Structure formats: C-alpha cells, structure tokens
Regions:
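Phosphate-binding and adjacent anionic-ligand microenvironments
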Residues: 1-148, 154-158, 165-173, 177-185
Length: 185
C-alpha cells in the first residue's frame, strides 16, 4: 500500500476479483485485467489497453517511456517473477492425497530452501473463503501456491519470487522449477 491504496488478495478468478469494492486494478495470472469494474464487471482487455495507452501518452509528455516507469516500480518494489506449473494426474484423488500428506507432514525444505510457513487455504485465511490448497512460504521471499485445477485433472502450482532484476528472478525460478515438480510428483 505504498501509494495509500488498499491491496486485496482473493481467490483465483474474476468472480472473486470483481467483488472487490472500489477496485482500481485487478488481474490474475491467466492474463486477465480489470481497470473499470463499474462498467465491465469481468476481465476486459479493451479497457486495460485504453488505460495503458493513456499511461504511455502521459509518460511521453514527460519524456518517459513505459520501460522507464517499470524500471522505477521494480527499483522501489523489486521484480516479481512468476510462473505456473501444471502437473497432470490420472485422477483428482491423487491431488487430495498429496495435499493432505503435506498438511499432516509439512516439509522443512523445498528445492533447497527452508520452508518458513504453510497456510492451509481450506481454513479461512486473511478474509478469504476456504478453498482446497496450500500457500507455502520459502526463505528468500518465495511464495508457492498449490491447488487442484477447477476444470482439469491436474494440480496447479504458482511460484512467485521477488528479486532486484528480471534476470535474477528468472534464475531463481529456474532453480526452483525442477525440484518443485519432482517434489510434487
């Protein structure tokens, strides 16, 4: 809330994002954006494109570019690198077994990084409704969310790392990806 704007974390999907009161900007990893939820109460690429064009125009008048703005944001808040991993399964019950196993016997490390904490999203967390999934925090500002897909026989894993640069984030994601897939398979 660096700019005195509230931040709200919700479950995946615009049915949850659109419920945020006075939403200024919402997005999900599946490339969906909302910038004018009063007009369009769902993801809306057209409004997002118009909004981005207005920002670019304003920056140009100041002699700046979108890249300049992004570099300023990354310098202030770090570069947030993200990746989604999908692990296909023969049947959904194997995901339930894995998640229940992690709940009963949490790991002390994943991909060589100490596990700082695990939030069981089946219990209400931070005002979120319960959902089947785990939010795992690793040393080094690394967040992993593991949940079953809502539409396919697969487990979805969302990784977020925060570093100083894009290259550092990509390197860290590369280091985590393989061991995480092996751990969860």
């Amino acid at each position: 809330a660096h700019y005195s704007i509230d931040f709200k974390e919700v479950l995946t999907g615009f049915k949850w994002i659109a419920k945020i009161e006075d939403l200024a900007f919402g997005y999900e990893e599946a490339i969906g954006y909302a910038v004018d939820s009063e007009t369009v109460n769902d993801k809306d690429g057209i409004s997002a494109a118009i909004f981005l064009a207005q920002i670019a125009s304003d920056l140009t008048k100041s002699g700046l570019t979108l890249t300049d703005l992004l570099n300023e944001v990354w310098g202030r808040h770090g570069f947030h690198g993200t990746e989604q991993i999908s692990i296909r399964v023969a049947d959904m019950s194997s995901i339930a077994r894995l998640l229940n196993g992690l709940r009963k016997s949490p790991p002390s490390e994943i991909a060589g990084r100490a596990v700082k904490s695990i939030d069981d999203l089946a219990a209400p967390q931070d005002g979120l409704p319960p959902t089947d999934g785990l939010r795992i925090w690793l040393d080094g500002d690394i967040r992993i969310i593991v949940r079953p897909s809502g539409t396919e026989a697969k487990m979805k894993c969302y990784i977020e790392v925060i570093t100083a640069t894009s290259a550092e984030s990509q390197k860290l994601l590369d280091e985590i990806r393989g061991p995480l897939k092996e751990f969860l398979s």
